[in-house]
Amino acid sequence: MRQIVLALALCLAATAAFAQPAPPPADGGAAQAPAAGQPPADATQPAPTPQAVAPAPTNPPMTGPRLLISTSMGDITLQLDSVRAPKTVANVLRYVKEKHYDNTAFYRVAKGFVIQMGSFDAKGKPHGIHPGPVPLEADNGLSNLRGTVAMARADAPDSATAEFFINLDDNVRLNHAADDPGNTTGYAVFGQVTSGMDVVDAIGNVPVGDNGPMPGQAPVTPIVVKKVTLLK
């Protein structure tokens, strides 16, 4: 009887030993491969479903005149779109021909958002005369993407005059609202930077302060717009 009990005890001890999990490798190495016929651990999980990557938003090619903005930090070339924004482009060209933009400044630098010019000189004083506003052309199929140029305006839709801004990022929230049946929302894109985006980014990163028409967004050192020229 004692032999049977002893044999049973030895059998239970052996079973318990095999039931204990193997300790992890002392050197922190990789776990051992699964036993023959057993799948790898991650094979028991469903494979991830490939996700379609949305293409980056783009604007259609723009057709129209070009402008050269000569600033104290370098030159910026704009391609305007007189097909999709004819009234806006004609309005801006009028100011260019009248030399309205000469000796003004990029007076607003909203980091990661926009840089803006058109109505103030380097001292932050109002510059020039605005003959009248231009009708809003935001519903023209052009989006406020990085490097695009759009008209600044007041709350009223048809209130843009001389001021415009360059987008430092994709600011699609500034676009015409899809559920707006008329041209009453958004900011009208009328051009695109084709050269000098490095200058735009440099302007967008200058130190700013409160000494200007846009407190907290006024360049500490004025960014002078020496001249805006219509290119042939």
Question: Which sequence ranges carry the predicted segments?
Answer:
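Hydrophobic membrane-targeting alpha-helices
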Residues: 13-17
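Cytosolic-facing loops and C-terminal tails of multi-pass membrane proteins
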Residues: 10
